[in-house]
Amino acid sequence: TMTDKVSANATPVFESFAPPIRAQTPLRKAITDAYRRPEAECVTALVQQATLPEETTTQIRATARKLIEALRAKHKGTGVEGLVHEYSLSSQEGVALMCLAEALLRIPDMATRDALIRDKISNGDWKSHVGGGRSLFVNAATWGLVVTGKLTNTVNDSGLSAALTRLIARCGEPVIRRGVDMAMRMMGEQFVTGETIDEALKRAKSLEERGFRYSYDMLGEAATTAADAERYYKDYETAIHAIGRASAGRGIYDGPGISIKLSALHPRYVRAQSERVMGELLPKVKALAALSKKYNIGLNIDAEEADRLELSLDLLQSLIEDPDLADWEGIGFVVQAYGKRCPFVLDFIIDLARRNNRRVMVRLVKGAYWDAEIKRAQVDGLEDFPVYTRKVHTDVSYIACAAKLLGARDVIFPQFATHNAQTLATIYHLAGPDFKTGSYEFQCLHGMGEPLYDEVVGASKLGRPARIYAPVGTHETLLAYLVRRLLENGANSSFVNRIGDKSVSVDELIADPAEVVRSMAVVGARHDQINLPEGLYGIRKNSAGFDLSNEEQLAELSETLKANATRAWTAEPQVAGAKVKGESRPVLNPGDHSDVVGTVTEIAADDVAQAMKAAEKAVASWSQVSPTDRAACLDRAADIMQREMAELLGLIMREAGKSMPNAIAEVREAIDFLRYYADQTRRTLGVAHKPLGQTACIRPRTFPRAIFTGHIPAALVA
């Protein structure tokens, strides 16, 4: 058993836990409050803002229809559209292609690569994807995965199916591996503007002459070491110099710009390291911004995962309020419409720009981490998702947020990034006929959006500017980006995928998202195939965790930890319900020996023998308890542990020296054990099942809560 008393001289160990980065102003609080708000509540408000006059919707439909018909008239299934349509992610081959590319990126040795290729290729029906009048790009990608390089250049694909069988029998995995490498390079040319910034700038000239603008992105994943961060910083610095020279005074709106990823510039870009981030990352970002200001080019801060959003807003606020960066309209920020906080983030940025007499670039995108956000919320046991579960809800959010940006063009330069013709047409008509440079612009990804925006850019088209987001990087850095793009656009709901599918009518593609939502049985209803985190396991309730990126939850958790920081716990053995006296010793916090967590009383050998006898006597009465009632005991214990979780976290962190995430994981594991065994008992044990009897559990010190809870309840109900 454990009791507690207040220690008179213990040091408060949680005094500096999760201090707020900034005071929660009303606008910032609105962002936090909307983090995981119920989907229907968010969408109900947004659908009203995205509902347009009938005259406007008629114009939008006409423009969208014209764009789609023009696209389909010249569409031959080439490039990414052909690839994602050919290798649908619902097919075994499509999944194998993605898994293969993703896995090869992470496998350093050739033998393991070959073993993986052998395993994946043997299960893929690649022959069915060869020939059939499909485009060379699709065929080349297919052959690049399974045969030698020379066949990827074969134009006449008749008879290649039989040749494939012969070649795979003749050639080993290394040849296939080289084919995979070639296919990735081919696809890389489709998605990446150049391996170096100079190569990318040179390649961009032809489209710039036709009226397109560019924003360059130096490819790379999040930094894991200081050396990574320094390398990425040098890459950005070099790129800004090159882009600045190439801009030749064209300015922010007509000239090229750069996009930067904050997680690439600091290896600990997380809320838990906010003080380090503000002290170490902010000066780096400011230096890049100052260099961009010198050349008068735009610098966009790319959007990342939901748990980094508020930290990025603090960095943005510091940049906008910095007098050294005044008189420059090139600070940009990317906002993701699939996030429930998006409208409130825009309110904050608009207010920030107005208060500081600045004009800020805001790139509005649909969102890039949807599957990861859904999975993470479920795995972490959070109250709800930070993103919408239906694509149409994101489309509604995008339109509502676009209207907000267009209404603040005095302090905002809106940049609308979309490959969806219906969304594009909506923005075009929302913005109105009056246009001048700097009013707003469209944006698209290199290798994916040019066919659509060929119908937009130029006086003979819609006469609106489009900026191409242009990734720059080597073959090694492009694979992760490539896989993300193919996964993103291979989804069944993707416009890029659907426009290449002739079974999808034009009327479906130009449907007004607000009208679609209003026609649903329940407006804003969450997708019925995506369980909330609590319902992840179906019948068995998932344990609830803490959102360590939510400022309100951090503040509440901090107060609870501080209130229990001086608590001195006492652990005493019991035999047959009675406390046993014995010698006690202090338990110290392994991370701070001045913190006496409490005392523990050791049990003597004779008392252990008495405990075993008492347990033996209790077997008869416990065996009369039905499995259902035994399971109910475990459920009650789980609910109590969930309710007392914050206090347990403080104890575990002090006693075992665990970090907050590890402590949360341990308590959640204990709760899951209880509910799992309760559920299994109800499912598998009959009414006549007798208990296991006497058991003993020896647990490791490293898991003071979870291991005992894992072993003992299972024995109790078994």
Label the model's feature ranges.
Residues 89, 102-107, 122-123, 618, ...:
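A short structural micro-motif
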Residues 183-192, 196, 227, 242, ...:
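Pre-Walker A segment
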Residues 461, 473, 477-480, 484-613, ...:
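Terminal low-complexity tails and localization/encapsulation signals of metabolic enzymes
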Residues 218, 303-305, 335-337, 364-366, ...:
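Active-site proximal loops enriched in glycine and acidic residues that flank catalytic Cys/His/Asp
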Residues 688-718:
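Substrate-binding/gating loop at the entrance of the active-site cleft, primarily
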Residues 90, 216, 301-302, 416-419, ...:
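Conserved structural-core and active-site-/substrate-pathway-adjacent residues in large, well-folded domains
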Residues 2-544:
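Positively charged, amphipathic and often flexible ligand-engagement surfaces
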Residues 642-648:
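Extended, amphipathic, non-transmembrane alpha-helical segments
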